[in-house]
From Swiss-Prot:
Name this polypeptide is given: Kynurenine 3-monooxygenase
Pathway linked to the protein: Cofactor biosynthesis; NAD(+) biosynthesis; quinolinate from L-kynurenine: step 1/3
EC number: 1.14.13.9
Biophysicochemical property: pH dependence: Optimum pH is between 7.0 and 7.5.
Any one GO molecular-function label of the UniProt entry: FAD binding
UniProt cofactor(s): FAD
Pfam family, one: FAD_binding_3
Source organism per UniProt: Aedes aegypti (Yellowfever mosquito)
InterPro entries: FAD-bd (IPR002938), FAD/NAD-bd_sf (IPR036188), Kynurenine_monooxygenase (IPR027545)
A GO biological-process term: L-tryptophan catabolic process
SUPFAM superfamilies: FAD/NAD(P)-binding domain
Assigned keywords, A-Z: FAD, Flavoprotein, Membrane, Mitochondrion, Monooxygenase, NADP, Oxidoreductase, Pyridine nucleotide biosynthesis, Transmembrane, Transmembrane helix
Family stated for the protein in its record: Belongs to the aromatic-ring hydroxylase family. KMO subfamily.
Temperature dependence: Optimum temperature is 40 degrees Celsius.
Amino acid sequence: MTAQYKQTNTNGLTARNLNVAVVGGGLVGSLFALHLGKKGHTVDLYEYREDIRTAELVIGRSINLALSARGRKALAEVGLEDALLQHGIPMKGRMLHDLKGNRKIVPYDANTNQCIYSVGRKHLNEVLLDAAEKYPNIHLYFNKKLQSANLDEGEMSFIDPTTKESTHTKADLIVGCDGAYSAVRKEIVKRPGYDYSQTYIEHGYLELCIPPTKDGDFAMPHNYLHIWPRGKFMMIALPNQDRTWTVTLFMPFTNFNSIKCDGDLLKFFRTYFPDAIDLIGRERLVKDFFKTRPQSLVMIKCKPYNVGGKAVIIGDAAHAMVPFYGQGMNAGFEDCTVLTELFNQHGSDVDRILAEFSDTRWEDAHSICDLAMYNYVEMRDLVTKRSYLFRKKLDELLYWMLPNTWVPLYNSVSFSHMRYSKCIANRKWQDKILTRVLYCCSITAVAAAGYFGYKYGNMDLVQHYSSSVLQLLKLK
């Protein structure tokens, strides 16, 4: 079907409409189809699973996700931000659970009270597909698994996993949004000079559920991301619209493998998550834990993302990451924003658009992959340490005093559109400043102690104090 919309770029020049094949009808694929459809391109979207809107259960994917500023911007550009925020549940900070069941609140942003939103994956995907279906120039095809592709020619072969029927098609542009195990990326990897790395971590995850109370309400304060940090492993819980909680246990596979029976499981939870037993329910805990196997976590980095002006990969296909920064979906949605802005700038020059996207985006994608890996250590271990809490308070104070200069790392990642690579550079700059300040203050303190020790004849105190300060600097 011919597109019904006239496309122009930001320079006011009319750009030709493209026939685009979007491979993958998940969150990123359906959103990018909307971005392209809105610009007037003809879009054929192919998804190898059945239509999620009619599926009773989506296997192997997290039920809910954290939506933050980058994702919100991409949704706003297709007019869906407000509707999804109304469905989402705002989370204004972390609520930490200790071994005794005591809870401590750590706000995300104590100064401006910004928050992230817990949104249902299935609902979000349904909204995106419903919106895409309203465009006459967007066509949705389900149960279409990519078998092979000639990316240089824009040719693809799909097969229906159920009927085994084959479909052959051709497009001006192929966009791979088909996840961490992308079939489109597999075609790109075959090309010489391609950089690719795949890293599995030794930790897996398993999902549980906290039901509503007998009164039908949330079992815990629902405007927080709840975390049970335990050093080498952790458990988290995000609220759902139906008053349930999606609980995810992250820990090494060796720990999972050591739990072989009901008794092992209950002993483990009584030791590390005692308050969660009553929240989940003993019978439900046992049933949910043993009904599925823990899933693996993978990080994928690669470049370039494009094949000339004929194909590009975005989302998890380009940069799959572990889920500990809540940026997987947001980074994928930001890919849509970045590409759309390049289409606005360069019109029909697809070679230039894809080359510029690939050249500039990979560094940011690699940066957020690394940050996500680091944040696992923070969430399961560092959040309980005084040094972490002190640094967070100091960051909040400096952010309050210098809001345009000193932006904490989490704020820059979750509440701004600053490039991910710049977020890391900012953090390194802040660390350097604080190290120098600590050093200068410590030297001044030692000098003052020396002066007063000499004046009052107490050099033992000076030596003890100086030794303590130098040890602090060494730890820093």
